[in-house]
UniProtKB/Swiss-Prot annotation:
This is Probable hemoglobin and hemoglobin-haptoglobin-binding protein 2. It comes from Haemophilus influenzae (strain ATCC 51907 / DSM 11121 / KW20 / Rd). Sequence repeats lie at residues 26-29, 30-33, 34-37, 38-41, 42-45, 46-49, 50-53. GO terms for biological process: siderophore transmembrane transport. Residues 1-24 form the signal peptide. PROSITE patterns: TONB_DEPENDENT_REC_2 (PS01156), TONB_DEPENDENT_REC_3 (PS52016). One of its GO terms (molecular function) is siderophore uptake transmembrane transporter activity. InterPro entries: Plug_dom, Plug_dom_sf, PT, TonB-dep_rcpt-like, TonB-dep_rcpt_b-brl, TonB_Hb/transfer/lactofer_rcpt, TonB_rcpt_b-brl_sf, TonB_rcpt_CS. This protein is subject to phase-variable expression associated with alteration in the length of the CCAA repeat region. This mechanism is called slipped-strand mispairing. Addition or loss of CCAA repeat units would change the reading frame and result in introduction of stop codons downstream of the repeat region. This may be a mechanism of regulation and a way to avoid the immunological response of the host. Belongs to the TonB-dependent receptor family. Hemoglobin/haptoglobin binding protein subfamily.
Amino acid sequence: MTNFRLNVLAYSVMLGLTAGVAYAAQPTNQPTNQPTNQPTNQPTNQPTNQPTNQNSNVSEQLEQINVSGSTENSDTKTPPKIAETVKTAKTLEREQANNIKDIVKYETGVTVVEAGRFGQSGFAIRGVDENRVAINIDGLRQAETLSSQGFKELFEGYGNFNNTRNGAEIETLKEVNITKGADSIKNGSGSLGGSVIYKTKDARDYLINKDYYVSYKKGYATENNQSFDTLTLAGRYKKFDVLVVTTSRNGHELENYGYKNYNDKIQGKKREKADPYKIEQDSTLLKLSFNPTENHRFTFAADLYEHRSRGQDLSYTLKYQRSGNETPEVDSRHTNDKTKRRNISFSYENFSQTPFWDTLKLTYSDQRIKTRARTDEYCDAGVRHCEGTDNPTGLKVTNGKITRRDGSDLQFEEKNNTAKSSDKTYDFKKFIDTDKRVIDDKLVLNNPSDTWYDCSIFNCENNAKIKVFKGNNYYGYDGKWKEVDLEIKELNGKKFAKIKDNDRKIKSILPSSPGYLERLWQERDLDTNTQQLNLDLTKDFKIWHIEHNLQYGGSYNTAMKRMVNRAGNDASDVQWWATPTLGEDSWTGKPHTCATTYEWNANLCPRVDPEFSYLLPIKTTGKSVYLFDNFVITDYLSFDLGYRYDNIHYQPKYKHGITPKLPDDIVKGLFIPLPNNSNSDPNKVKENVQQNIDYIAKQNKKYKAHSYSFVSTIDPTSFLRLQLKYSKGFRTPTSDEMYFTFKHPDFTILPNTDLKPEIAKTKEIAFTLHNDDWGFISTSLFKTNYKNFIDLIFKKQETFKVGGSGRGETLPFSLYQNINRDNASLKGIEINSKVFLGKMAKFMDGFNLSYKYTYQKGRMNGNIPMNAIQPRTMVYGLGYDHPNHKFGFDFYTTHVASKNPEDTYNMFYKEENKKDSTIKWRSKSYTILDLIGYVQPIKNLTIRAGVYNLTNRKYITWDSARSIRSFGTSNVIDQSTGLGINRFYAPGRNYKMSVQFEF
């Protein structure tokens, strides 16, 4: 109730401040209806040396772009377009944004998806997330996740795949355009809940009335100890101009609340401290342009981005355990993840006015994106006790012979007290350490034939001898010392020694552990390679006194998506007592190799498996045309009409012997059954596997989609604006949703190439009070209907033959498949306002107040909550700017309500035997205060600083809470006690600072 009163109060204050002066300060100019929902892949960067025959609208557009790149507050007094937010480079600098999460930090209704150790994975808007929110950079779609629910159930809970959407370097961005609601006119497939469009910088953004620009920026953030350096160079020489932006970031994991107080030695799901990672990011943006005339421009661009994360998943549970039956972890998982994007593009721009265009832009792009997850599982020597290198007796090699830890001769407990040393008998099971402590049963006694000594460590000179144990019997530990001769042999170019005497009573003495740590590794790549050709044109014209701002064009693209998995094992931390050689054949005397030995040894025979994949490589061909027209009927009425047609074709591309192989067991007998009694015949199995893969690979699929958008803007007065929007968006099924195949008795997934595209239709109405001097307040009501949601369902049980010839066994297999099932509906309200206080009193000149609010409610498939919906959120802002931009500050208060249990849905509640379907771990209500400021002591120097979470509030966001998995080995906590949940909490009080020099 308190939150409601605060919300009404804030709204009333803003409304009063804006409307109360609307009549008193009406501008003399009439309202101008501008396009509200334009496609963003049109040419917008026009040269500063425009020809004089360019129309005024284009010139105003150019001026706006230049201003947005060079001032602290650009466009802040302009009424917002319906369901759209634009953040310029200067806005991002002012808010000290370092990553995509910071971009939407002070936006309501938009959040990022948390993905554990892999960081963020796209955005959540209007109740949907990840692939249902389109992301593109300079007109290119970015990599999508493997969104098949079957794939997620099998693999996502175990941290083996970097199944995330790639990010972007903030310092290279000129503008970020965030659209809420369905709108495929801009992006095509994927724009169900909205879209996020990045535009990179251009030399023309800096070369305004000068021929060069140099900037160096240094920053630091305490939340993850990240430091960054950015160098920006721009220059113009005659008909050429160039831009280079290079950024390097170095930091570590995000420090959760109480980070320094938690035990960093705890391993497993109960770990409270954030897992340790070293995170690096490098980015380079290069643009080189040539202007042969003022109407023609050629540009070569290279956008290079790489994000690397190396560390340990100490919260990862290597042993899959049920509650109440837990054993300590021995090994730990070491990670080395990478996201790499490379886009090379060539573009041609034409600014000559013709009957068909005022501007034309033709762009060819070649984009390659790789997301890699690399994991190595082994015990950390020096951090914890490791059985593989266990040496409690402290044996070592001193001057070529085995000694105790202080270099003295080995000692064992005497069995008889006799003065004559040659008659003394010892218990070789009881070793006497240098401190006289008896260590029991920690050494191994090996036969001479099984013992080899590395001559690079041991003394192998002529007549070399070594002291060994000789037992009283062939068994047992009682015996005497004996010095024996060594035999030198050269195996595979290296010298080794072995005991000459093969008496079975003679035993070598070594530590009982293997002498190395076994390391299991796997490396899994998801590659998306795209080639795209875009043609974008604009034309302004007038028919019957109606002004038209026409934008049209098309694109053709091909994208290849594939998975490549590599795995193997080897050894690390190899000790002196590890077996140094595979030895030789006792009959032929030939050295053993990994192919001939009967003993497996990770140190001497590291294994690398053949490349394999769980997905067929899929080639996607897309063709699209679009048309968008903003036409102004009068100064009080305008319309935006948009239409887009997409044709998308999926083609599996599998070549036997070349393409990474699908594991036999996941496709064997799936569609084409095995012949009788052939399950044990490897040739028959191989043939059947190829037949089933060929069957799946022939399932080509084509989609056609029609998208549209209609916006009406009505300005009945100079201070009131009414906007109406109706739009349609779509998302075609991803290749993995259609083609992913897996066969197992408990969980068999069938492909489905008959899936329909997901559809979203948005209706929205916005009321805006605005004044050129006072600012604006806008309220919008919206509703989005989704249909044909793709979901995984249980189909049936079917019997398959298993076992070899003669057994004839059959087992029931549970079959699952993706289908179009869920329909969903979401509605809500948003408020966006900003009021400038300078008109109220002279001393308040430069001050402004802002307020944003979003409330959403949605259900799918009848009454199932949509987890991607954020709790009710509001952001209050107080800002100030010096008239000459010498200094300024922003003070933000963000309040987020609790996530109600009835608004959450746990899809596994039946399997977990839960009474209801609500999610147990949810976010509570919290309020966060942030203070950000800047000062410009001299013209060329800007210093920025900020303190975030000023009151050091402990809180968890809903996106972090919903990333906790109820099963698996990654992103899990102790569900019964809640231990481990602190790992997901946001940072406490933290600081950011940056210094920038500009010339």
